[in-house]
């Protein structure tokens, strides 16, 4: 989870069935190494909070030549699938940009407390930021945070398994049980961070395979992926924002319908009163 500035690589995504996942990992087992960040808590989770503006600056970029996302990444660990995941001391803020399968990141890593301060100061400088890694990424991220109306809009949560191969030039991740949530505040190290039912907006695909690599795919990987179609248009950010929008519409629609019904009733009452008055004013009408 080290800081990376302007790293450029290729990224492919696949939305898979359980059988496809089983077959894929059986095929690559001897070529890739499992990443474990905490031996005592080997089950890893990722919580990602996406930022956007009131006019959907970042969401609109998903439909252009360069898709941009500003996001906060927090990591949680658990001893087993039954245990509650707790927040780790590692967190990062990053600007991710995609053009086709090519992607680049400007990322800074720091404690959740320090990143909270960076976000709240909206790009203003502070001596405390000197400890961030790498410091060269700070101006770019401060510039993004200074955009008017920038604010957290969506949080995603999923369990992640990661593997590396080809001397680190290839990274494979499997995200399971993707969940879209209302935006969450930055957590406290050691706190339980699994989303509660009140914060959950919708569920995403059950299994998402992501391949990040520099250069061409190795032959063994190409063989393992045979018969699997890349999900070219898939985006956690885009799907999650659409889910948030649908949720808001579902909440607003009954309120708007009730307001319209009240307005119609008021107009009917006013029309009835006006009609009585007009009729009574006609000479000879009794």
Residue ranges and their predicted role:
Residues 1-286:
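Phosphate-end processing signature that detects enzymes handling 5′-triphosphorylated RNA
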